[in-house]
Amino acid sequence: MVGRIPDRDIAAIRERVCIEEVVGDYVQLRRAGADSLKGLCPFHNEKSPSFHVRPNHGHFHCFGCSEGGDVYAFIQKIEHVSFVEAVEMLADRIGHTINYFGTATSVQRDRGSRSRLIAANAAAAAFYAAALESDEAAPARQYLMERNFDANAARHFGCGFAPSGWDSLTKYLISKGFEFTELEAAGLSRQGRRGPMDRFHRRLLWPILTLAGEVIGFGARRLFDDDPMEAKYVNTPETLLYKKSSVMFGIDLAKRDIVKGHQAVVVEGYTDVMAMHLAGVTTAVASCGTAFGDEHLAMLRRLIMDDNWYRGELIFVFDGDAAGQAAALKAFDGDQQVAGKSFVAVAADGMDPCDLRLSSGDQALRDLVACRKPMFEFAIRSLIPDGMVLDDDPQAKVDALRRSVPLVARIRDYALRDEYARRLAGWTGWSDEGQVLARVREEANRRSVPERTRRRSVSVEQSPFMQPPGAPADQLAARPDPRDPTLWPQREALKSVLQYPVLAGPVFDTLTVESFTHPGYGAVRAAIDAAGGASAGITGAQWIDVVRQQTTSALIAGLINELGVESIQVDDEKLPRYIDGVLARLQEVWMGRQIAEVKSKLQRMSPIDQGDEYHELFGDLVAMEAYRRSLLEQASGDDMTA
């Protein structure tokens, strides 16, 4: 059994780690108000940012998919690890030594499973890099030199060599304290007929790293004709760490420049990435052992995008027109917001970036990227023959138009579709631009009728904001609409006390559960009370955690996290006055209900038969109305807008 991590270490690590820096390794964040950052959610596909991080409170929350929690929850979710492994990862990040206690072997006490696999891969990368300097690795060095990659380039990209020995790496790593089961789980070793053996032999290797810079696998290139494994390239198999659908070579090196320049360049191979980076195109990445897919796209979009408007560029560099055309045509069926800002670059002679750099130098690669074509244009023009052919053959002109109109009609953005229709007239040499535009619109309308019908039939079921069919009534009731103006003071009051308990403190604690008319908000108020109230002296991420622990309802716990992260739209210097005003407004609403009850009771009483009681209650009413007026004055000066 793994030694237990003391609570004091868990709290200390959470306190020292900056959640915005951790999340920033995976998501590009931009300021969105006081102590609020936002970006595209890494846990579901979205076009507009609904993922928020509150640095001072140490929490995140997505208003699109409801994922949320502290920095440990984020690492658990994004890296698919246990809580213990998340703590260990963050401890490594800040150099914190965990003082485990309880029974455990020395290896178990040292690390959890994921961390052990990361450590094994890192040790393997160092072993392979050292082996690249050996005499046996001369063919690997020659392969790199022939492509104009010197020793410095090899070190920069972590290139290595797998020796010919049956179990050279395996024996080395076992001597360093790793177990064979760990090496097998990491994809570094496997069980052979003669016992444990290395996975890679006599191959040039590239380490594949995560956004956070952790080695999780390798790509290996065949060098020798007598290599029994005929595949030119092989990769680490699917492991706990290595998922080929979501890893990219070079992403660790390109990440910062992708974020800074709002641009990513996607190439097809390891040497292409190396060539691009060395030529100054430092945003180049490549998929590993599989085609570029949705998860790769989602990762790059999170780095490129920074607000509700998609400002980035995704540039695909292909070896030839056929590959580029196939990829471009797929864009019409995918996310066209991305496709509309995607580009294709193909060298005139069909050379890949590595060969182009060899033949024409670094400037040729920079020019290749600079001369990119919009993906929609590339796809459409791939269906149109050379202009001279069209001039000489009227039938070819008609055929080109017939092929191209349906493709242009698939563009869903009306303005963009019309613009490409006009361009299509020019590309095909069609003199009547209006006729082409009308044809495209007619085709688009024909296609849109079944599409609109389909969308109507699934819109309710697929809405991310709807409860699943058959959801319990109490769950539906406990899910308040954040846009409901009648509930706005209650929501703002709860946000204030969860995010700034010191400011909300004593006044909030005077509010009863009955002040919160929505069951969900009332349940949150009850949880705050059970946690000791706003004046308990607990602040930051710990305060929200303590409140969340007071409920057994996952829905209410999620609501607590949501309220603890949702931005309060006011400048820091105005926060105290704003919170006072919010609480005053909520008190005023509650006081209004109390006054209505007193008035109703007075109407049922006789001032003659119940004189003393009547006059006493009337005096209370006068005092209550005076207090309500003071609350109204306080609330009216809070600079709030509902």
Swiss-Prot record:
Residue span of region Disordered = 445-480
Reaction equations catalysed: ssDNA + n NTP = ssDNA/pppN(pN)n-1 hybrid + (n-1) diphosphate
GO MF terms held by the record: DNA binding; DNA-directed RNA polymerase activity; zinc ion binding
- Name the positions where Mg(2+) 2 binds: D319, D321
Pfam families for this protein: DnaB_bind, DnaG_DnaB_bind, DNAG_N, Toprim_4, Zn_ribbon_DnaG
Q: Which GO terms describe its biological process?
A: DNA replication, synthesis of primer
State the domain notes.
Contains an N-terminal zinc-binding domain, a central core domain that contains the primase activity, and a C-terminal DnaB-binding domain.
Instruction: State what protein this is by name.
Output: DNA primase
